[in-house]
Amino acid sequence: MRPSGEKVVKGHGQGNSGHSLSGMANYYRRKKGDAVFLNAKPLNSANAQAYLYGVRKYSIGLAERLDADYEAPPLDRKKSSDSTASNNPEFKPSVFYRNIDPINWFLRIIGVLPIVRHGPARAKFEMNSASFIYSVVFFVLLACYVGYVANNRIHIVRSLSGPFEEAVIAYLFLVNILPIMIIPILWYEARKIAKLFNDWDDFEVLYYQISGHSLPLKLRQKAVYIAIVLPILSVLSVVITHVTMSDLNINQVVPYCILDNLTAMLGAWWFLICEAMSITAHLLAERFQKALKHIGPAAMVADYRVLWLRLSKLTRDTGNALCYTFVFMSLYLFFIITLSIYGLMSQLSEGFGIKDIGLTITALWNIGLLFYICDEAHYASVNVRTNFQKKLLMVELNWMNSDAQTEINMFLRATEMNPSTINCGGFFDVNRTLFKGLLTTMVTYLVVLLQFQISIPTDKGDSEGANNITVVDFVMDSLDNDMSLMGASTLSTTTVGTTLPPPIMKLKGRKG
C-alpha cells in the first residue's frame, strides 16, 4: 500500500515540474462545453466517493491530504462508480436543507410549504400528497376564519364617523388580513422551490468533489433560535397592537397571529437562504485562494469556475423561485408601513397616546422585516460576485503557466457575464437600493397624506361639526367649494361684460 502512495506523490511532484507541466495540463484539460457553463453536474449525484480515487486528482482537497502524509488507496482497487456519496463518512449530504429545516418545519405546520422530500436531491411537489392535502384543509379553515374577521372589520369601517386618522387605523386592521393570499402563491411556486432544494444538493456534491470536504454551513442553531423566538415576538406584537388600538377580542386575534407569523417566518426563511449563499461564497473564495498556492494543471481553476457558476445560478434561481411571493410581500410591507406611519404622525399633534404604541410597534416591526429582506439579498449578491472578483484580481499570474492564466482570465470574464443579483422574476432586484426606493416613495406619499390631513380644518373653518368630518364629507365639500368658486368666477365675468358698454355710451354723450 505504501508504494502506491509513493507513486501518487511522485506523480504529483512530476506535475509540478516544468518538463511535464504542459503535457499534464493538456491531459487534464476538459471539454470546453463542460467547463464553461451552468449545466455542470456532479460526476454522479451518487458518486462523490469516487473523487478520492482519481476523479479530481489535482484539487486542493487531495493536495492537502498528500501534504499531511495521506496514503492514497491502492491503484488496483476498483473505483466505486455505483457507490453513494452518503456512504463516505466524510461526506454529509443535504447540509443546506438540514440547516434551514427548522423554518421549513414551522412553515409546513401552518400549511405553507407542501413539499415532499424522500432524500437528497429528491424534493418535489405532489398535489396528491398528504402534505398538500393538509395545506389545503388548513387554508380553507383559515380562510373561513379570516372571512369572518374581515366581515366584522368592514362593518367597523362603514360605521366610522370620526377623524380621518381613525379611519386609517381601521383600514390597517383590514390590510393585515392580506397575507393569506401568500399561501396559494406559494403553492404555485412550490415546484420551483423544490427544484432549488435539489440544486443545492447537487451543488454540495460538486463542492465535495472539488474541495475534498462537505459544505461547512453552521446555521442550524441560528435557525432553531429563530423558529422559537420569532413566533413569540410576533404574537406579542399582535396582542399589544390589539390592546392599544382596539378592543381585545381573542377570537379575532388568533388569525392575525397566524398571518403575522407567516410573514415573519417567510422573512426569516429568506434571511437563512441568503446567509447560506453568503457563507458558501466566502468559503469558496477562501478555498480558491488557498488552492492557487499549489502549482497544478489549469483544470483546477476550471473546476472552481464551474463551481462558482453553479453558485451564481443558485443565487439567481432563489429570486426566480420566490418571485411572486416576495413581490407580494414587498408591496404588502410598503402599504402597511405607510399606513402605520401616517396614523402615527397624524395623531402626534394631539400628544403621544396609547394608540401610538401599537402604531409604533407595527411600523418598526415591518420596517425591520423589509430591511432584513433587502439587506441580506444585497449581502449575498456582493459576496457571490464582487468579493470573488476581488480574489481573482489579486491573483499573481507571473508564476503561472499560460493555460492557468487563460483559465483565470476566463474566470474573470465569467463573473462579469453572469449576474449574481437576486432578481424577483424581472420585477426588481432585491437589494439595498430597493429598500431606499421604497422609503423614498413612502415619504412622498406621507407628505401628500399629511397635507390632506392638515387641509381638513381649513375647509370647515370654525364650525361645530369640524371634529366629526368624514372622508366622503370632505371630498364633497371640496367639490362644492370648487363649484362655487367656478360659479362666482363665471358670474363676475358676465357682469363685467354687460356693464362695460354703458360707461362708453355715456362718454360719447358727453362729447356730443
From Swiss-Prot:
Keywords: Behavior, Cell membrane, Glycoprotein, Membrane, Olfaction, Receptor, Sensory transduction, Transducer, Transmembrane, Transmembrane helix. One of its GO terms (cellular component) is membrane. Expressed in the medial aspect of the third antennal segment. Carbon dioxide-responsive neurons coexpress Gr21a and Gr63a in a pair of chemosensory receptors at both larval and adult life stages. Residues 1-24 are annotated as: Disordered. The chain crosses the membrane at residues 130-150, 167-187, 223-243, 266-285, 325-345, 351-371, 437-457. InterPro entries: 7TM_chemorcpt (IPR013604). It is found in: Cell membrane. Residues 1-129, 188-222, 286-324, 372-436 are cytoplasmic. Induction: The Myb-MuvB complex mediates neuron-specific expression of the carbon dioxide receptor genes Gr63a and Gr21a. Conversely, Mip120 and E2F2, are required for repression of Gr63a in inappropriate neurons. Residues 151-166, 244-265, 346-350, 458-512 are extracellular. GO terms for biological process: detection of carbon dioxide; detection of chemical stimulus involved in sensory perception of taste; determination of adult lifespan; monoatomic ion transmembrane transport; response to carbon dioxide; sensory perception of smell; sensory perception of taste; signal transduction. One of its GO terms (molecular function) is ligand-gated monoatomic ion channel activity. Glycans are attached at N261, N468. The keyword Transcription does not apply. It is a multi-pass membrane protein. Gustatory and odorant receptor which mediates acceptance or avoidance behavior, depending on its substrates. Gr21a and Gr63a together are sufficient for carbon dioxide detection and avoidance behavior. It is possible that the CO(2) receptors Gr63a and Gr21a activate the TRPC channels through Galpha49B and Plc21C. This innate olfactory avoidance behavior can be inhibited by inhibitory interactions of the odors such as 1-hexanol and 2,3-butanedione with Gr21a and Gr63a. Gr21a and Gr63a probably form a heterodimer that responds to CO(2). Belongs to the insect chemoreceptor superfamily. Gustatory receptor (GR) family. Gr21a subfamily. This is Gustatory and odorant receptor 63a. It comes from Drosophila melanogaster (Fruit fly). The gene is Gr63a.
